[in-house]
Amino acid sequence: MLSSALKLTKKVCSTKSNGLIRSFSTQTQSRDYAVVDHTYDAIVVGAGGAGLRAALGLTEKGYKTACITKLFPTRSHTVAAQGGINAALGNADQDDWRWHAYDTVKGSDFLGDQDAIHYMCKEAVPTVLELEQYGVPFSRMDDGRIYQRAFGGQSKNFGKGGQATRCCAAADRTGHALLHTLYGQAVKHNTKFFIEYFVTDLIMENGDCRGVVAINLEDGTIHRFRSHATVIATGGYGRAYFSATSAHTCTGDGNAMVIRAGLPCQDLEFVQFHPTGIYGSGCLITEGARGEGGYLLNSSGERFMPRYAPSVADLASRDVVSRSETMEIREGRGVGPEKDHCLLNLTHLSPEIIDERLPGIRETAMIFAGVDVTKEPIPVIPTVHYNMGGIPTNYKGQVITQVDGKDKLVKGLYAAGESACVSVHGANRLGANSLLDIVVFGRAVANEIENTLAKDTPHKPLPPNAGEESIANIDAIRFSNGTRSTAEIRLEMQKIMQRNAAVFRDGQVLKEGVELIDKCARSLINDLKTTDRTMIWNTDLIESLELQNLMTQAVLTMHSAEARKESRGAHAREDYKERDDANWMKHTLSYLDVNTGKVTLNYRPVVSETLDQSEMETIKPFKRVY
């Protein structure tokens, strides 16, 4: 409905602030805003794999559901996932979901919560079969069963039986196939989509989530969505870095909304570098290329991974392979005039195999590297790919905060996918566990809402000032009169993150990074210049809001990394080279006071107990080698 009576005060100018939200106290101009109000049982923010699976599940169950997305659903970044989705189907070889869980716990470097890992790996098989029934066009074996390929960090018989073949694939376009299928199912079940709406903030009341505020990009109108359940499924924040496989839309908007609401994010220091981003462009070359038999080379033409991972070589976990590449480059065995990258060789594979199983890779390599993969290797380099950290949740998707050192559920708020930290990935994600994560926990959220929310539950009125702070922030950005453009500040942030929170880290570099990123954040607040003052398709405004979101997470990532005095998974410190379970086998909870810029770090224990010890025993920590 259109609420013409609601008057929100527009605050144009601002005092300088050390925080990430401006302080509005110097000048104000009163202007009436006509705000469009909506009421739904549930709203889902984001329309990638997790968001669509949650929205589809909710509409299937009869809930009035809205899915709000800043871009068309099939442009969501899930579409770029290539390699596949893990499930112990046992089509290509004997397999067991417990072996999958073992590999996931080991891959997480024992920071993964074993109750959530238990749930995800057990649910993997029915989840993939459900996707098949929905219509995902998986590649097929000769007997008609779903094709499975080898992927990194995966084994049989709890690490004792050799390489597992567990990754279910639709050639090298699995994410594309999955996303289009889920979108079709969501449309079939009459999910209401609000496309090209940018969600700015959560609406909170007494610690509970009541909905969200959004901008309609087409006409600049403000919309308030009231709901009993709000699901955040907005993906990661890879674009905080200079070189990333992520789309430019991957700005972690949901994470930042949660942070602005005074809630924590978890384990943001763990950022995955994929071993095979194309040198120069950062475009992803799937791990499936190595699963099909590809291997890495240094400048001597040596296949070097057997030196670092004797048992599995190029199919070690991603953090191990990325560090190995970096060591080769550091020790002068890099390729090219600058000796700053490695090569991925596929030339020994037949063109028929490549065309059948890796057609997209052949095309991508030609477009972005000028390489015919049947004749020459692809230049590659470790590239930011995935955020293990995010919004802390339990395995049901309910968002967690801490009160007096104890976990507390945030009523009405859920998260799933890369924006969430369940935590099934811990300190390092295994390849092909991401598509599994988004579908399993997108469905889990819908199931939990069904268990806790009665249909036709009446809605309470929203707080009368709901949305005021969000609109004040929008106007503060629109009327910023500093000296630096959004693009200039964004580039500075990305280069700081690329340099100071990289594959290898140490205390001095991280301490410098904390100082630099805090200074960059202050520059965003105090010296931003925008030129478009309108509200209709104002890309200057939206990019600035996205930068604000990225900066929020970049600050917490750097502070969290500087504080963690150990090496674990993707967080590899040269001054603390060993994993320290006695002091650091715990999750980081990071808070940011957006008004003052103050960062607070707390910690919560890793869940080491499985859901059912008789079904799956706890996997105790051991030294992680491949």
UniProtKB/Swiss-Prot annotation:
Binding-site residues, substrate: 274, 286, 385, 429
Catalytic activity: a quinone + succinate = fumarate + a quinol
PROSITE patterns, per database record: FRD_SDH_FAD_BINDING (PS00504)
Transit peptide, start-end: 1-24
Keyword Transit peptide belongs to the record: yes
The keyword Magnesium belongs to this UniProt entry's keyword annotation: no
Modified residues (Tele-8alpha-FAD histidine): 77
GO cellular component: mitochondrial inner membrane; mitochondrion; phagocytic vesicle; respiratory chain complex II (succinate dehydrogenase)
Ranges in a coiled coil: none
Topology relative to the membrane: Peripheral membrane protein
Subcellular location as annotated: Mitochondrion inner membrane
EC number annotated for this UniProt entry: 1.3.5.1
SUPFAM superfamilies: FAD/NAD(P)-binding domain, Succinate dehydrogenase/fumarate reductase flavoprotein C-terminal domain, Succinate dehydrogenase/fumarate reductase flavoprotein, catalytic domain
Main location (coarse class): mitochondrion
Pathway connected to this protein: Carbohydrate metabolism; tricarboxylic acid cycle; fumarate from succinate (eukaryal route): step 1/1
Family the UniProt entry places it in: Belongs to the FAD-dependent oxidoreductase 2 family. FRD/SDH subfamily.
NCBIfam families assigned: sdhA_forward (TIGR01816), sdhA_frdA_Gneg (TIGR01812)
Role this protein plays: Flavoprotein (FP) subunit of succinate dehydrogenase (SDH) that is involved in complex II of the mitochondrial electron transport chain and is responsible for transferring electrons from succinate to ubiquinone (coenzyme Q).
Record note on quaternary structure: Component of complex II composed of four subunits: a flavoprotein (FP), an iron-sulfur protein (IP), and a cytochrome b composed of a large and a small subunit.
Designated name of the protein: Succinate dehydrogenase [ubiquinone] flavoprotein subunit, mitochondrial
Species lineage: Eukaryota, Amoebozoa, Evosea, Eumycetozoa, Dictyostelia
Gene (UniProt): sdhA
